Regions:
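Structured catalytic/translocation cores of nucleotide/phosphate-coupled proteins
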Residues: 1-12, 18-24, 99-103, 107-111, ...
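Nuclease catalytic cores
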Residues: 2-65
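Detector for Asparagine
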Residues: 11, 26, 51, 65-66, ...
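A generic structural signal for solvent-exposed, polar alpha-helical segments
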Residues: 26-27, 56, 81, 90, ...
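Short N-terminal secondary-structure initiator segments
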Residues: 54-73, 114-116, 124-129
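A short acidic/basic microdomain associated with nuclease active sites
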Residues: 59-97
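Mg2+/Mn2+-dependent nuclease catalytic core
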Residues: 85-86, 90-135
Length: 135
């Protein structure tokens, strides 16, 4: 059986393997939760902020002041990025067997020919020590 996997389906697999199996075999879909409007609003604000710097050909100060971001730039193909940022269209990769990884990106940094996907994390509480290990 071939699968189309997204970040949310992988989270479902981690949270509830049975729910994942039932979903992927079209038996039952777990009800969705309340839409997180505050994080969604922050996501839009961050995208507008990054686009201002993309238009100037610069990195935003949050990144240009980070030593790990030296020689990086924001992906500059606005039309392609708009598609990849859309949850319904996004970007996909298919393996040799036909399984698909699919999702939307928040932003992309470029280093030579390599792409680095940025995933904005918005939450209403301070980061914990082990937060980075979850990603």
């Amino acid at each position: 059986m071939l699968f189309k996997l997204s970040p949310s389906s992988l989270n479902l697999m981690k949270e509830c393997p049975r729910c994942f199996w039932l979903d992927k075999h079209n038996v039952w879909k777990r009800p969705s939760g309340i839409f997180p409007s505050l994080p969604s609003g922050m996501d839009k604000i961050l995208k507008v902020h990054f686009n201002k710097f993309r238009d100037k050909g610069e990195l935003p100060p949050e990144l240009c002041n980070n030593k790990d971001c030296i020689n990086l730039k924001l992906f500059d193909d606005k039309e392609k990025l708009k598609i990849w940022q859309n949850n319904l269209r996004g970007i996909s990769w298919e393996d040799k067997e036909g399984n698909v990884l699919h999702g939307a990106v928040d932003n992309i940094l470029v280093h030579g020919k390599k792409f680095i996907v940025l995933d904005y994390k918005t939450r209403g509480y301070p980061l914990k020590e082990d937060t980075a290990g979850h990603y």
